[in-house]
């Protein structure tokens, strides 16, 4: 069952990645602004806001996930920022930000930048991805997974489902002690799971204890790309749940 929990009032920017920690909802906009809402009261108006340190016209902030490590002096665990903009110089980067709260004021700094290098995956026997990696932190197990596909998931590139596959690739979560810049390549891959392609247009997702919960579609803009959720089990290596939320998406 799906129902509206909070009808947020934002600044008018395109809503993108969202995360929750304790009583705070961190709702990100394209470009890097973050609106913060009170989870307990579900007040539609933000209680605070700030700019990500990685704010940039090309930073789509497509997905955000809190990690397992907290930088000294910070108020929240590290936040992993997925760019998600195809063709951008930022496309293969994950900005790891540390957020500090002082009263009603929030601020953020880049604690680490992770670059994904997929240039030699095929040489090592792994399935390649087209780009736009979505960085998903599995806090329960302490790993980070990259979710993407062989080809772009828009209809003009993938015309038929059989042409494509979704790909989930497992890595360690780099610690801050590894430095300000870290590169993950084919030698860092711990596991890879390939899932059937049956829904178009990736949005964002999250992980919990080995399962990927991912959203797809564009709502009522296009009936051929309906809003839906899939649950991918990386242990069983299969899709374990399918949800259609087209009726609940008002746009």
What are the roles of these predicted feature ranges?
Residues 10-21, 60-77, 125-145, 150-151, ...:
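Structural signature of eukaryotic scaffold interfaces centered on beta-propeller domains
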């Amino acid at each position: 069952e799906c129902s509206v929990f909070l009808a947020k009032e934002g600044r008018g920017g395109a809503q993108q990645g969202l995360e929750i920690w304790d009583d705070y909802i961190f709702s990100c906009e394209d470009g890097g602004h973050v609106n913060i809402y009170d989870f307990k009261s579900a007040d539609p108006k933000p209680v605070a806001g700030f700019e990500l340190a990685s704010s940039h016209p090309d930073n789509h902030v497509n997905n955000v996930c809190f990690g397992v490590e907290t930088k000294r002096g910070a108020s929240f665990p590290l936040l992993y920022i997925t760019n998600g903009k195809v063709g951008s110089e930022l496309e293969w980067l994950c900005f790891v930000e540390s957020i500090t709260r002082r009263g009603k004021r929030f601020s953020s700094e880049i604690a680490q930048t992770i670059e994904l290098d997929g240039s030699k995956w095929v040489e090592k026997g792994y399935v390649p991805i087209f780009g736009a990696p979505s960085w998903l932190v599995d806090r329960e197990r302490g790993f980070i997974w990259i979710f993407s596909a062989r080809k772009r998931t828009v209809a003009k590139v993938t015309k038929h489902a059989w042409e494509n596959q979704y790909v989930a690739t497992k890595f360690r979560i780099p610690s801050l002690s590894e430095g300000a810049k870290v590169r993950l390549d084919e030698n860092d891959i711990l596991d890879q799971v390939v899932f059937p392609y049956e829904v178009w247009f990736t949005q964002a997702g999250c992980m919990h204890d080995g399962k990927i919960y991912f959203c797809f579609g564009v709502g009522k803009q296009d009936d051929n790309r309906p809003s839906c959720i899939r649950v991918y089990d990386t242990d069983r290596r299969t899709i374990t749940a399918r949800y259609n939320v087209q009726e609940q998406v008002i746009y």
